[in-house]
UniProtKB/Swiss-Prot annotation:
Belongs to the RuBisCO large chain family. Type IV subfamily. Homodimer. Mg(2+) binds at residues 202, 204-205. Binds 1 Mg(2+) ion per subunit. The keyword Magnesium applies. May be involved in sulfur metabolism and oxidative stress response. Does not show RuBisCO activity. GO terms for molecular function: magnesium ion binding; ribulose-bisphosphate carboxylase activity. This is Ribulose bisphosphate carboxylase-like protein. Keywords: Magnesium, Metal-binding. It comes from Archaeoglobus fulgidus (strain ATCC 49558 / DSM 4304 / JCM 9628 / NBRC 100126 / VC-16).
């Protein structure tokens, strides 16, 4: 949306038919409240342009039209309920200021949308995402809207019940190399990391169902290898099979993987779209946990002045759609994310949210054993450690790499921050060698 275009809209004498209101003048249970960062050139009236944006995302267009009557407006118009300038100039805008920055709140009638994630995105992001400086920061959902969603089928407690692990973070391994053939190579690595002590093995997000590594071949080989490892170690391991594909293949992949024995699914939820994640999570025939991978997320959240905030795109929304585990960036490895944002995303996964179960945060991206105490210090025990190369690159092999991470988790849960000291005191050679990588 070009802010320089002349936009006109009709104002009615009835306040309830206009695209603005006091926060106290609306029923919060009838509206989804979107909070935005917006910036406008100095000469523009922020109160008028924000109302134009509200109309653009509800009843209006760039000119008044006959059908947009007061009655239509009363039922369906979005309303600006807050425009707050930062800093809050009261006397005058300084001459040197060219762009003025605002926090804006717009209330959208949720019945315009229904409990549909595709229409939610079309409404709260939609056309206005083309404004040069506009970023969606948060969405406040009314309880009645959220009643239409089931959320995670397992959640934190359910995944822990499946694995029988209650008192520590879980350990996940991504098979490396990311893309490989034949499937036997991955199955061999899966056996090694499973017997070394990982709780979850996931396909890389880049490997789903290519001709050279079909789900029909891969899943039986992986599950046989994992079953052997579980028998040896006396613990259970989940295998998250990547079912990502276009519709309807993604749903067919999920059905096929489960028929072949898969006990967990992985989907690249932003590549497929939130409705696909939701369809998998709410399918009664799918009785396994679902892991949601973050790829494509950077296109939404990385810009400080446009897009969608990380706490929404990585936090609240995948949880609402039904993810049991959400993969997202950790600030301690190769992924760029501020530590406070990474913590805030985890809060969106775990804090109370009506009837929606908490889900596991899974910080990822270049994680090494030395980072585990930081992860535990910032997130506690209810998260999943995501380790890929940090396990497979261990000089004594993947099983030793997995043991090194388990040792690091044990140390962190005992309050150790100096892993070398802990490893030396307990003669843990796997951890000592991992700390040298």
């Amino acid at each position: 949306m070009q802010l320089g275009v002349r936009l006109r809209f009709q104002k009615f004498e009835y306040p309830e038919a206009n695209p603005e209101a006091l926060p106290e003048g609306i029923d919060p249970e009838e509206y989804i409240i979107g909070t935005y960062y917006m910036s406008f050139p100095k000469g523009m009236n922020p109160f008028e342009i924000t109302q134009v944006l509200a109309l653009e995302q509800s009843t209006g267009t760039w000119l008044p039209v006959p059908g947009e009557t007061p009655e239509v407006r009363r039922k369906h118009v979005a309303k600006v309920v807050g425009v707050y300038e930062i800093p809050d100039y009261e006397i005058m805008v300084p001459q040197e200021v060219d762009w003025r920055n605002f926090i804006v709140q717009i209330a959208f009638p949720w019945r315009n949308i229904g409990s549909k994630l595709s229409m939610l995105f079309s409404t709260v992001v939609g056309n206005i995402s083309m404004a040069p400086k506009l970023k969606l920061l948060d969405l406040r959902f009314p309880k009645e809207f959220v009643k239409g969603f089931k959320g995670p089928k397992f959640g934190i407690e359910g995944v822990r019940d499946v694995l029988g692990v209650k008192d520590r973070p879980l350990l996940n391994n991504m098979i490396k190399p990311d893309v490989y053939s034949p499937p036997d190579l991955g199955a061999k690595l899966a056996y090694e990391v499973a017997r070394g002590g990982v709780d979850i093995i996931k396909d890389d997000e880049l490997l789903a169902n290519p001709e050279f590594n079909r789900i029909e071949e891969r899943v039986p080989k992986f599950m046989e290898a994992i079953d052997r490892a579980d028998e040896e170690k006396g613990e259970k391991t989940l295998y998250a099979v990547n079912v990502t594909a276009d519709l309807p293949e993604v749903l067919e992949n999920a059905e096929r993987a489960i028929e072949l024995g898969a006990n967990c699914l992985l989907v690249n939820y932003l590549a497929t779209g939130f409705p696909v994640l939701r369809a998998l999570a709410e399918d009664e025939s799918i009785k396994v946990p679902i892991m949601a991978h973050m790829d494509v997320a950077g296109a939404y959240y990385v810009s400080p002045i446009s897009g969608v905030r990380s706490t929404l795109i990585l936090g609240k929304l995948p949880r609402l759609a039904g993810a049991d585990i959400v993969v997202y960036p950790a600030p301690y490895g190769k992924a760029p994310m501020m530590e406070e944002k990474y913590i805030e995303v985890a809060k969106q996964h775990r804090y109370p949210f009506y009837h929606i179960k908490p889900c596991f945060p899974m910080p990822s991206g270049g994680i090494a054993p030395i980072m585990v105490p930081k992860l535990v210090n910032t997130l506690g025990k209810d998260f999943v450690v995501a380790a890929g190369g940090g396990i497979h690159a261990h000089p004594d092999g993947p099983a030793a790499g997995a043991r090194a991470f388990r040792q690091a988790i044990d140390a962190a849960m005992q309050g150790y921050t100096d892993l070398r000291k802990y490893a030396e005191e307990n003669n843990l050679q796997e951890l000592l060698k991992a700390l040298q990588l």
